[in-house]
UniProtKB/Swiss-Prot annotation:
Originating organism: Salmonella typhimurium (strain LT2 / SGSC1412 / ATCC 700720)
Function: DNA ligase that catalyzes the formation of phosphodiester linkages between 5'-phosphoryl and 3'-hydroxyl groups in double-stranded DNA using NAD as a coenzyme and as the energy source for the reaction. It is essential for DNA replication and repair of damaged DNA.
Ranges where the BRCT domain occurs: 593-671
EC number: 6.5.1.2
Protein name: DNA ligase
Length: 671
């Protein structure tokens, strides 16, 4: 695997993790600014290598899937997200793209609004009566929060006025004003309840209560900013006109909505709002800029995940200066040793920050950082922000160099740094307590074996008390042994045992992912499972055979081969199977028996599809015997090019590979 492929894999894994925490668990670990930075970095890398873009990349989708605790509502009109810009130059480039697409030299009229920092919702009115409400979810399917939305006093249960459409779906943001947030946390501290990190978390947690009576006690409010379904009625032909109409029908709309007739007017609006931000009484993280004319919006259209006629102009992350008092080293699941700066505590964006990630030795060298230095930190996460730079002009006299350990700080094993990699790793494997903990946490995680109720603190105790050394030991736990753990009663212990038993029935792909093989994420695990079909076949595969799997190169193939060549790993797998871990036998697709032009072909999808999602297209192609790869090579038989196909299309043409468009694909799928 090339270094850029490794970067892409790590970035996508990190972004998916934070999408899940943000959209599903309502417990984000990082602020939007850091998420945006990660997404921006991923987009920039993918722009350098479009042939490495995969259908499941976070850049190709809107958000994360919803929980199943609520009923689900499918959005008849998808709730898309907005693309972001972060500086004046990027906004001016966006403005120029819009003008170029419209083939106009005249200034566009922009409607500018606040970008609220809450939870996006859709509310459906039929004949003026509120009938349902849903979260955005993944943009296609959200959670039914009707009962909770009905408790928000700002949202009318019935619209008033004339010419109300038969069906009207409004979109907007539910949020918690600063005063309400402070009161909730004050009450929580007094009663020993949950204290929220910020108003957005509090709003999301309040809105997604299973008991609407709890939601009703929270001072949530709402601003409307758009429309989804519109049937049996008409709306004005400008965005501002629609907002004013919503307001006339009784829907709350922000009073900070302004028409701007030039790019400079937009920039003035942005800076004025940024200046007023501390006095608004509620959290925002930027401004939203939309083409005011609905006719022009229609002309501009959409890209895969966002409209071309709107953009979010985000505020910069907040920064502060403080001192590095020490540097400690943490060990992760794969043995990666990460330096963490211990800081003189400082308030950043309302959070007391005392730690900052330093990533790796290269980053420390790049910063020129020493213990004792004065540094600028940016709040890149609620837990561990990042050091942006060293204030060299104010370097104290008594600073010390940061020395990377030559032995693991946890188990004492040697450490190694593979040439070409930035990461230093402990070589101790499962004899290292830190790696053991993180490996087990990964094994039981939701996307791996999905052991409900077995959280990080339980794993920590199990390892520290030496109850568990390998994943197989988890399935030997009894309720009696678990009851001895902190805060674990008999009922909770039995629930964990039941969850472990339930998790024994899994899939081959999940099992492979749970093993924690280096560089094998969910997508690669699924590819390996689909290609080899059985564990026995995979274990017997050579490095050359492994590279025949779509998107598996020499680096990943070597990691997989070495993992199964290690006797201790084979022993653990044998123990897991002996404890009853199993999955359904593979459904073998005989491509010779499939009457389809795609059977046995290696196919690459590129560009955006309008008739179906890439995931749906991929599923249908696989069902017809195709192998769907993420990049074009000499092995590729066919490229399906959607709108705005890029370098994959160019490479296919260069290699003389057959190319078809979406319409031809759909025709062949039905053949």
């Amino acid at each position: 695997m090339e270094p850029i492929e490794q970067q892409l894999t790590e970035l996508r894994t990190t972004l998916r993790h934070h999408e899940y925490l943000y959209h599903v668990m309502d417990a984000p670990e990082i602020p939007d600014a850091e998420y945006d930075r990660l997404m921006r970095e991923l987009r920039e890398l993918e722009a350098q290598r479009p042939d490495l873009i995969t259908p499941d990349s976070p850049t190709q989708r809107v958000g994360a899937a919803p929980l199943t605790a609520f009923n689900q509502i499918r959005h008849e009109v998808p709730m898309l997200s907005l693309d972001n810009v972060f500086d004046e130059e990027s906004f001016l480039a966006f403005n120029k793209r819009v003008q170029d697409r419209l083939k106009s030299t005249e200034n566009v009229i922009w409607c500018c609004e606040l970008k609220l920092d809450g939870l996006a919702v859709s509310i459906l009115y039929e004949n003026g009566v509120l009938v349902s409400a849903a979260t955005r979810g993944d943009g296609t399917t959200g959670e039914d929060i009707t009962s909770n939305v009905r408790t928000i006093r700002a949202i009318p249960l019935k619209l008033h006025g004339d010419n109300i459409p038969a069906r009207l779906e409004v979109r907007g943001e539910v949020f918690l004003p600063q005063a309400g947030f402070e009161k909730i946390n004050e009450d929580a501290r007094r009663t020993g309840g949950k204290v929220f990190a910020n108003p957005r978390n509090a709003a999301a947690g309040s809105l997604r209560q299973l008991d609407p009576r709890i939601t009703a006690k929270r001072p949530l409010t709402f601003f409307c900013y758009g429309v989804g379904i519109l049937e049996g009625g008409e709306l004005p032909d400008t965005h501002l006109g629609r907002l004013l109409q919503f307001k006339a029908w009784g829907l709350p709309v922000s009073d900070r909505v302004t028409l701007c007739d030039s790019p400079q007017a937009v920039l003035d609006f942005y800076h004025n709002v940024e200046k007023d931000r501390p006095t608004l009484g509620f959290d925002i993280d930027g401004v939203v800029i939309k083409v005011n004319s609905l006719a022009l919006q229609e002309l501009l259209g959409f890209v895969a995940r966002a409209p071309r006629w709107a953009v979010a102009f985000k505020f910069p992350a907040q920064e502060q200066m403080t001192f590095v008092r020490d540097v400690e080293f943490q060990v992760g699941r794969t043995g990666a040793i990460t330096p963490v700066a211990r800081l003189e505590p400082v308030q950043v964006a309302g959070v007391l920050v005392s730690n900052a990630t330093l990533h790796n030795a290269d980053e420390i060298e790049r910063l020129g950082l020493r213990i004792g230095d004065k540094v600028v930190i940016r709040r890149a996460g609620d837990v561990i922000p990042q050091v942006v730079n060293v204030v060299l002009s104010e370097r104290p006299e008594e600073t010390r160099p940061i020395v990377f350990p030559t032995h693991c700080p946890v188990c004492g094993s040697d450490v190694e740094r593979v040439e070409g990699e930035a990461v230093t790793r402990c070589t101790g494997g499962l004899i290292c307590g830190a790696q053991r903990k993180e490996s087990l946490k990964h094994f039981v995680s939701r996307r791996a074996m999905d052991v409900d109720g077995m959280g990080d603190k339980i794993i920590d105790q199990l390892v520290e008390r030496e109850y568990v050394h390998t994943p197989a030991d988890l399935f030997r736990l009894t309720a009696g042994k678990l009851t001895g753990l902190d805060r674990m009663g008999p009922k909770s212990a039995q629930n964990v045992v039941n969850a472990l038993e339930k998790s024994k029935t899994t899939t081959f792909a999940r099992f492979l992912y749970a093993l924690g093989i280096r560089e094998v994420g969910e997508a690669t695990a699924a590819g390996l499972a689909a290609y080899f079909g059985t564990l026995e076949a995979l274990q017997a595969a050579t490095i050359d055979e492994l590279q025949k799997v779509p998107d598996v190169g020499i680096v990943v193939a070597t990691h997989v081969f070495n993992f199964f060549a290690e006797e201790s790993n084979r022993d653990v797998i044998g123990q897991l199977l002996a404890e009853g871990v199993h999955w359904p036998a593979p459904v073998v697709i005989n491509v010779q028996e499939i009457d389809s032009p795609f059977a046995g072909k290696t196919v690459v999808l590129t560009g955006s599809l309008s008739q179906m999602s890439r995931d749906d297209a991929k599923a249908r192609l696989v069902a017809l015997g195709a192998k769907v790869a993420g990049s074009v090579s000499k092995k590729t038989d066919l490229v399906i090019a959607g709108e705005a196909a890029g370098s994959k299309l160019a490479k296919a043409q260069e290699l003389g590979i057959t190319v078809i468009d979406e319409a031809e694909m759909i025709r062949l799928l039905g053949a």
